[in-house]
Amino acid sequence: MAACRGLIYLLIRTRLDEAETSAYKLRTRQLVAATSADGIILSYPKSGRTWVETMLSHLYVRRFGLAKTRVLDFQEDRTQFPELPFLFFTHDYAHVTSGRWLIPMRRRRLHFRATPTVMIVRDPIDTAVSMYFQLTRREGHLNDIDLYDFVKLGKGGLVTIVEFMNFWARELPSIHRHLIVRYEELFTSPLEKFGEIVHFFGIEFDPEDVQAAVEFARFENLQELEKAGELSDWRFSDGAVNDEDHLKVRRGKIGGYHDYFSVEQCAELEKFVDAVLDPVYGYGEGRSDR
């Protein structure tokens, strides 16, 4: 078995060009996980994945009678809780260097084809703003660039996010079962949209369990729990945070980018999205939902 794994590693490793060497471990993990998982949750960073994961986790936290603030890992915790489905949460190659590295466009994602996949998307301008605060406030990077310049020009900004989304707009039709969930719809109709995700994966829970998961993951509740350092997952802050821009649960506002940019700057960013982003996601002209 070890020899087989070594051969697979060598085959994969030799296919990576110099620009991709930093991602070979992720690529190997993704090849294995995507083909063996019960389901995939795919997103660009800062699009709402942790929110969905927290709701899914809370379903099983209630079922197993665990502390309500525990956030289960759908891979690592399956040893302790075999009933957990194997759900693979991935940012694809955008996970490398916190989204500042462009996805390799020439690589198909054939290993996703047979696995039911939910893609969570968010208005890319809001995503870019959230990514900026992730990199500057939470991780301490990018102190030499202001918000607008990062969103407009920076790696991990709007161009990168739209490129990621367009790549997956081309790939999704090859996946036998897939579902696109917009952050904005999940925000305005959480019970309905989360219920769609639960149904899509064939997870059986009573309506009151789904309702409880949605209530637990309300923005205000998660933010207060994060401020108090009561959430078990490492991605949340450990408490004592006064600046909300340092929090994982930061604002959760639809169209929040308007609070940071001038009317002219917003128009320029929106014009780019209108012209370049694939319309399959439903963003573009007519931003009444933002």
Model-inferred region functions:
Residues 168, 196, 205-207, 229:
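Alpha-helical subdomain
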